[in-house]
Each structure stands twice: as structure tokens, then as C-alpha cells.
Amino acid sequence: MTQSSPLKTQQMQVGGMDCTSCKLKIEGSLERLKGVAEASVTVATGRLTVTYDPKQVSEITIQERIAALGYTLAEPKSSVTLNGHKHPHSHREEGHSHSHGAGEFNLKQELLPVLTAIALFTIAILFEQPLHNTPGQIAEFAVIIPAYLLSGWTVLKTAGRNILRGQIFDENFLMTIATLGALAIHQLPEAVAVMLFFRVGELFQEYSVGRSRRSIKALLEARPDTANLKRNGTVQQVSPETVQVDDLILVKPGEKVPLDGEILGGTSQVDTSALTGESVPGTVKPGDTILAGMINQSGVLTIRVTKLFSESSIAKVLDLVENASSKKASTEKFITQFARYYTPVIVFLSLAVALLPPLFIPGADRADWVYRALVLLVISCPCGLVISIPLGYFGGIGGAAKHGILIKGSTFLDSLTAVKTVVFDKTGTLTKGTFKVTQVVTKNGFSESELLTLAAKAESHSTHPIALSIREAYAQSIADSEVADYEEIAGHGIRAVVQNQVVIAGNDRLLHREKIDHDTCDVAGTVVHLAVDGRYGGYILIADEIKEDAVQAIRDLKRMGVEKTVMLTGDSEIVAQSVAQQIGLDAFVAELLPEEKVDEIEQLLDPSGKAKLAFVGDGINDAPVIARADVGIAMGGLGSDAAIETADVVLMTDAPSKVAEAIHVARKTRQIVVQNIVLALGIKALFIALGTIGLATLWEAVFADVGVALLAILNATRIAK
């Protein structure tokens, strides 16, 4: 059996994607190449992501196809792809109709020929009546034809080039046919007016897209540009990508921290808002970990770099946001497919309107039906939808990132809008996870000191918060030689040999399994039972605190229409009930093993798939549950690679109230996307009907077409604010 070769994903920066059909043109052209599985263009950043089989199609072939379409190409200035060397590409084609600066657009320069055309057109209109059907009519033509060429030269040239390439059914082709058709039926003023309206509208569309692109990119400006590298007693400014692990860097007040590292010298206040969305400053000191993207506010910091820039927290965050568009929502996929078929269908409908009625309706005026067909051609470009829908989703993702919420794709934005059940893990999610030993209860002759010592040493290799709290209460150093045969028993506890004694520390289930008689503790807190050489030694009571915003988080979710809030925990029934009652949860399930949480999630899932379930955990211990939920949400992503890798949505802080905020952003995005779809399709349907029955003019049609595109784009940019 032959095995398929692994697919490769390549990212490229494409210049000149300010036109309404560029996205469809590039995606469609690349996906027709044999071996290309998917091509996805992000209009907002000019980023192209191509997934392909390198055995069937080469990267060179893909680059040549993009260059043949008339776009410039370079490797993206990505936070994670600049590790090492760059391979800039400069594929140019003279005469491409759009600016090639990945969003750079000179409106003043583009407006000059259009304004000249408007002046000439105005003169032609003023003298149209006096000169009509007179020898002086040639003067009218001498003014109006240059006006047509000035306003439409770019459109005509692009349409001609695209026809030679076999690329028809874009807006340039449609406007060329519509205006040449108007000229053919002696509608000169209308032909010029349509081209002028279209060109002015297109210019403002390009300007609006460029502006929204810049506003969205501004959300992602946390990327540090330089690093102050300390080497051989000197400090020099270098690119963060060139700094190596264990290098020393200096961060001055007001500067962004360029790389993740450990503070060796200096104390300061840092602003973490670029990562968390919250501008509350935190204090850092020698020994603390500091992350790229934070802003140093006061002291001078000397930092030892612990990660390359490509592996830093901010690089992963930026890459996640920039690449979120590759995971498209069903709405976005539908619009892309719809746009590919809609334009050809309307073109053929236009042909039918122009040709059939004069053949079958006695006395039908051929020029009148041709005019109606031209109106349909003008309205047949789905520009507003093609740009505004992806722009809306990207704005939602960028706006959420500004508030410390990372959403990995528009498909998860859509899923969040339908969430009706939210399931929380307890420890570290609803509670602080900062455990403290509150009581040591001894049995069978053990002292408190002896029990705490044995427990701390037995737990010395564990990273669980409960183990950390026991070691913190013991407050003495523990040598590795004091502990042997350490074994972690998932969902139960640990076993280790301490001072030649077999120590078991864990929950009720562990002692039941070992058939050791022990107390049944009816207390609100986490109980760690201890047994030494099979003899019960007592238990340690550990308390956890509920997070300050946990109660408000549940209230917000209820207010938003979430029908059920549930907590899953491995803790005892008593502890779970106490937390659930204090917070106001609808239900809880206690004493669960990690694998049992997945079973509980499956029981809560909606069989129809319409009502979505979100699970909120720490992204590390809850990976299987996060993967099984409709929407997996990981909290505390700040500095946690595992959380960023695992979940569909990452909350950079530990605040459960961010869950409601994420759902709010998703619903706002969805609302604006639906508004744009209804607006664009409604206007187009209206003018198709009016055009067919002869109640719409070319002027009105082009005004409606470019107007609705502008409105949809401007509406989409509201999401990011």
C-alpha cells in the first residue's frame, strides 16, 4: 500500500491585495494546482498560507503562479519564521493595478487621474444638450472619451491582461463589459459615470481596507524590534532573532522586553497588557522570569535569555493570531464558495436578459434589454462579502487578542457563539490553586512534625500544587538521597521510600486500593492521607481559595444565556459541594480520575451538535478533556507553552471572567458578519430584481455596489475596537 507524503505548510507575504477579487483570485488559482490541498489568504495582513504536497508541486511553482497573477511576494515578517536567514522574493509585473506594499496605498496619487476625469465629465455633461445632434458633438466626444479612459484605464488594462490569462469574471472584466456595452448603445455619459463611480468606490475601498489592516496590525504591535545585547563589556542594538540562549540583554525603562528570560539584575515594574490585555503593573526582581512583549516601566533590567525569539511567548502569541485565519468558519467557507459561483451565474443571467426577451417578446427594444443586462453585470461582483467577512473575523480575533484572549480561528469564534454549557475544572481555574496547609491530624502515635516531614519528602519530586504547599509548610531543604523509588499514581497520590520507610500519600481511593484503614474526613478542604509501612499515620488538611471574579464569571455567563455551568474535580464531594454553592454553579461531579472527566464531558455534549460545550481548564493536566470539548479553553496561557498548544481558546490570565468576555467578542463578531451578509445580499437581490424589470439605472447599480462594499468593510472594522 502506498503512503501519501506528508503535507507541507508554507507562509508568504503577498503585496497588492487591496482589490476586492484578489483573495479569491489567489486562492482559486493556487487550489487548481495539482498537489495544493488548501490556500488561505488573510486580507487584513497580506498573509498567504499554502498547504501542499511537495512531491506533486514545488514551492517555486507556487511562487511562479502568484507572480503570474501580478503580485509581489516575500517571506512574511513573522515572529516565528525569521529564525535564521530570509529568502526574499521579488516577483514583479509591470502595470499591475494595485499598490504592492502589503497595504500601503497612496490615495492622493491614485485620485489625480480620477479627479481630472471628473472635471472632463462635468464639462461634457454641461455641453451635452447644446451640442447634441449638431456638428459640435465631436467636441463632446473629444472630452468624454478622455474622461472614460482616464477613469477606466487601469480597469481596462487589468481586464485585458486577465482575459489573456484566462481569468475572467472579476470586477475589472465586469465593469469593462458593462461600460463598453453602454458605449455600444450610445449611453456615453452613463458609461463614463459608471466607470467613475466604480473607480472612486474602489479607491475608497482600497483605502478602507488598508486603514482597517493597519488598525488590526496595531493590535499586534507587541513585537519587539530590537534587543540591547551585552557582550564583552559593551551594549549594542541587534535584532531579537539574532540573540542566543544564555546571552545577556539590557532592558531600559520604557522599552519592550525582547525575549523570554531570567532577571539577573535590577528591580522594576512591568506592564503585561500586550500579553494579558490588563494594564495592571507587576513587580519583577532578580530570579523572576520575564517574558517578551512586557514593557519595562521603571528600573534597568539585566536579563539572561532562556528562549530563542522564535520560541518566546510573544512570538507564539503573534503567530497564533496572524495564522488564525487558516481555520475558517463555515460562514467564511460558504461565502468563498458562494462568490466563486455567484458571479458566473449573474453573468449568464445577464446574457439571457440581453438575448432572450427580444427573441420572444414582440416589439421588445433590444437596446433596452441590453441596458438591463448591463445593470445586472454591474451588480454581479460580490466585493463587499469577499473582503468584509474575513476582515470581520480577523478583527474579532485581533480585538480579543488585545484583551488577552487568543482565539485560534474563526471556526472557534462561531462555536463560542453557540456555547450553552460551560464546564470548569476546579483547581487553578475557579480556585486560586495556591494551597496552604491548615491542619495536620495525627494517628497511631505519629507526631505532627514527623507526619509533615514524611509527607514533604515523599512529595519532593511532585510538581502538583498540593505537593508544593506541603513542602512550603515543611520549609526545609530536602536532599535527593533522602527519597528513593518515587512513583506517581495518577488521580490517587504518590508512593516513595523515605528513610527506609514506604510512605503512601494521597486520597481516600489510594488508601482503599492499598487496603489501609483510615479516617473518613467530613471536612471542607483537600485531604492528603498518609500511611507509613502500611500503618495509617493521619492526614494533612489543605485549603484552597476561590478566585475573586469566579462568582461574577458565573453570573455573566448566566446573563448571556449559558444554560448550564458545571464543575469537574478530583476533590472530595464535600469540597466540591462547598465550592459549587459559593460560586453558584448548576452542577458538579467530584472524586473523578483524569480519564473519567472525558466520560463526563461526553455525557454533557449535545448529540445534535447545535448547542456547544466549552471546557475551561489549565491546558496542561486537562489536555484530553480540552480536546474532547466543542471548544477547549485554557487559562493561564502567560508563559505556558502547553496551554497555547493544547486549546482552541487561550486566556492569557487566570481570570475565569475572561470566558464570558470571549463569548461576548464572538457574538459581537457574528452579529456584524451576519449584518454584512444580509446587507450585501439584500442590496444585490434588490438591484437584480430592479435591473431585470428595468427600474434601475447603471448609475444606481454601481453606486449600490461600491456603496454596500464600503459599508460592509467599515462595519467589519468596528469589531476590533
Curated annotation (Swiss-Prot):
**Domain of life of the native organism:** Bacteria
Transmembrane intervals: 108-128, 141-160, 168-187, 191-210, 345-363, 370-387, 672-693, 702-717
Give me the gene this protein comes from: ziaA
Species of the source: Synechocystis sp. (strain ATCC 27184 / PCC 6803 / Kazusa)
- Main location, first listed in the record: membrane
Which residues are on the Extracellular side of the membrane? 129-140, 188-190, 364-369, 694-701
Entry's localization field: Cell membrane
Q: Which residues form the HMA domain?
A: 8-74
Name it: Zinc-transporting ATPase
The UniProt catalytic activity note for this protein reads: Zn(2+)(in) + ATP + H2O = Zn(2+)(out) + ADP + phosphate + H(+)
Kindly state which keywords UniProt assigns to this record, in alphabetical order.
ATP-binding, Cell membrane, Ion transport, Magnesium, Membrane, Metal-binding, Nucleotide-binding, Phosphoprotein, Translocase, Transmembrane, Transmembrane helix, Transport, Zinc, Zinc transport
